Design a protein with these regions (language model features):
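"A position-specific structural signal for the A-helix of alpha-solenoid helical repeats
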Residues: 5, 11-12, 51-58, 93-98, ...
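Eukaryotic tandem repeat interaction scaffolds
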Residues: 6, 20, 52, 85-101, ...
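Terminal, low-structured helical/coil segments at or just beyond the last alpha-helical repeat
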Residues: 112-174
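TPR/Sel1-like alpha-solenoid repeat signature
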Residues: 13, 17, 62-63
Length: 174
């Protein structure tokens, strides 16, 4: 839990700095969020097991703000090329779709988003991500307001927790 809080705090700081167009501080906070300090109780997993799409997406936004198109393209490509799980949906998939669209691969991004609704028709996170992708901010806000409503699931049915969702909600609510 310690490492997760450390990462989230640094990413929230990066988002705050991004809203103030303080791009150097965004990069610094993102780099810090990628660290795995030993005293936070968990060891670093293998690199291929780490989902850095949010960090890379924030860093791409900072690079774009600094006018570094080469770095922006490389970071967006890293976000877009992340291997997406077919067994469950992660809100980071929204970042992959946006990275594709921002890289000029609009059809591929649109196809990805359309597949979400087919593969996960009842998933509220999918519905929220689709609304954000399509620019339907009011619809997305309405979905968040009903987010804490009781659902008819038991604890053992809700086995997957999307640890990036709150961070991604924050990114698109600023």
């Amino acid at each position: 839990a310690g490492r997760a809080v450390y990462r989230e705090a640094n990413l929230y700081r990066a988002m705050e700095q991004l809203s103030h167009k303080n791009y150097k501080q965004v990069v610094k906070s993102v780099e810090t969020s990628k660290e795995w300090p030993e005293n936070l109780g968990v060891g670093k997993p293998y690199d291929n097991m780490i989902d850095n799409r949010l960090e890379d997406y924030l860093e791409a936004k900072a690079a774009a703000g600094q006018g570094d198109s080469r770095k922006t393209s490389a970071l967006l490509a890293a976000v877009a090329d992340y291997t997406i799980s077919r067994s469950h949906f992660e809100s980071g998939n929204l970042l992959s779709a946006l990275a594709l669209r921002e890289s000029g691969k609009v059809q591929e991004a649109d196809h990805m988003v359309a597949a979400w609704s087919t593969d996960f028709p009842e998933n509220r996170v999918v519905q929220w991500c689709t609304a954000i992708y399509r620019g339907e901010k009011e619809k997305a806000v309405g979905m968040l307001q009903s987010r804490n409503d009781q659902t008819n699931t038991t604890p053992w049915e809700a086995s997957f927790r999307d640890s990036n969702f709150d961070l991604i909600v924050r990114l698109f609510s600023t």
